[in-house]
Amino acid sequence: MTAVAWPYANGPRHIGHVSGFGVPSDVFSRYQRMAGNRVLMVSGTDEHGTPISVQADKEGLSTRELADKYNRVITEDLQGLGLSYDLFTRTTTGNHYEVVQQIFLALHRNGYIIPKTTTGAISPSTGRTLPDRYIEGTCPICGYDGARGDQCDNCGNQLDPAELINPVSRINGEKPDFVETEHLFLDLSAFTESLGKWLSTRTGWRSNVLKFTQNLVEDMRPRAISRDLDWGVPIPLDGWRDQSMKRLYVWFDAVIGYFSASVEWARRTGDPDAWKQFWTDPSAQGYYFMGKDNITFHAQIWPALLMGHNGQGDKGGEVGPYGQLNLPDEIVSSEFLTMSGSKFSTSRGTVIYVRDFLREFGPDTLRYFISVAGPENQDTDFTWDEFVRRVNFELANEWGNLVNRSVSMAAKNNGAVPAPTSPRAADEELKTLSRNAFETVGGHLQRSRFKAAAQEAMRVVSAANKYLSDQEPWKLKEDPDRRDAVLHTALQVVSDANTLLTPFLPHSAQKVHELLGGTGVWSAQPELREVSDLDVPEREYPVLMGDYAAEQASWESTEIEVGRPLHKPTPLFAKLDAALGETGPEWAPIEKS
């Protein structure tokens, strides 16, 4: 199962967002399908909480109208990027509410949810509750100035807004009022031993995730799971369910979305129990993809919720209504994609929206850039100069030129894939290189090393270009047998390289498949489908689903068929104007030196 962090539905998403949750998860999922594994890739829009209400006020919409608006925008953009979700849904469905409440009740029955009187942050100007993440100040532990009210991204410690030094609202900069209020808490202290033991076994995670988990084990204290709001999942307890201004905290219901989306997917496929193969089968593997600001929720809180439901916390308890659910196997967290050294920010105007980018450059250029030059292990600055260089040199000159030269010459001289005659050592050496790359590239992808995987695939492309330049088939008119052997070798390696690059470049991979005479679906794309809510039929919304079982791409070198008709190619990737690297498009923010 590929569980992808849920984009927040308070506005369109920018390329910094999809560099963390979007492209890496799809590259991984496409590879796993090609390798013959059953994959369930799920996510959706996160639609509850104060930020939705605040943005709705700004736009003069109701909270539901705003959620509907950006749910559609985000769904359309992720479809355009080619993210192959088995289900991309939303958190305002009847199915999600039911699943969240059932897991809440299981945790409550097992004693992992407790009431506490606490201090809540209120905006003096609006009277509205401020979510912890919307309060910023100085961390009392490490002194970091940009700590949030829920955690410090610098030291990884969990915080309470009232603990911050000089706390201010991130919405309008005012100092919040702190008032007493009663809330429900997830008793994380009741998972100190069980969760700590589990985290100690996660030695293979990325270093940035392991850094945070070390602090998590030392800071296991109760964490609020309710808020004074009227927009969210109702609390299914006597004395709470009828309170109009008490709802489950957005972070609590959002992480449960991975499971509720799996249940919804199963219901929509006509087999309501299909989710069990990914959640209760001990052999199933769960991979979670996100940006680094979500590590705590996935490495500490979500495992604790699952343990509490399963009766596996320090207090024990009964197994919940869904059976014993699997804990995460891998948490794949990316760092931040920045611009001019700063995080992408809508409020500061440092933002490149996915929709704008796709309209001008198409999906595969962005997918490739994020894969080979994105923030896999450290914060990475996006520059137009680097983007133009990668597109022009690697995609257009290297990969596009290899496809064009190989297919054009074979189509012109033979009209079809020529038969190899008397292959030489150089031919076999190149074919061996491309065959062996499947194990190397696949190994990197299995370990979520996307940069290394893309670079290794491009090494095959570079070797094939050198081979063509060395063999000079355009000079072999008087030796057609040798020319055909060279062109057959080149076409075979183009076919292999196209397979190796398919997880990164699924749209152009389909085109190369067809240029090589292939028919049918090589690399399937997600479909936007209009559906009715399974539990509230009068509500309709868009989802992403797809028929990925129909695609032909498989993770192996397949011998190219002699005599297969070839088609005259058109450029795979258009070269970009070098001046674009200096200024970027007119609609893009100006880079600061």
Swiss-Prot record:
Keywords: Aminoacyl-tRNA synthetase, ATP-binding, Cytoplasm, Ligase, Metal-binding, Nucleotide-binding, Protein biosynthesis, Zinc. The gene is metG. A motif ('KMSKS' region) lies at residues 343-347. It catalyses: tRNA(Met) + L-methionine + ATP = L-methionyl-tRNA(Met) + AMP + diphosphate. One of its GO terms (biological process) is methionyl-tRNA aminoacylation. ATP binds at T346. It is found in: Cytoplasm. One of its GO terms (cellular component) is cytosol. Monomer. It is an enzyme of class 6 (ligase). Its EC number is 6.1.1.10. GO terms for molecular function: ATP binding; metal ion binding; methionine-tRNA ligase activity. Belongs to the class-I aminoacyl-tRNA synthetase family. MetG type 1 subfamily. Binds 1 zinc ion per subunit. This is Methionine--tRNA ligase. Zn(2+) binds at C139, C142, C152, C155. Is required not only for elongation of protein synthesis but also for the initiation of all mRNA translation through initiator tRNA(fMet) aminoacylation. It comes from Saccharopolyspora erythraea (strain ATCC 11635 / DSM 40517 / JCM 4748 / NBRC 13426 / NCIMB 8594 / NRRL 2338). It comes from the Bacteria. Its cofactor is Zn(2+). A motif ('HIGH' region) lies at residues 7-17. The keyword Nucleotide-binding applies. Its main location: cytoplasm.
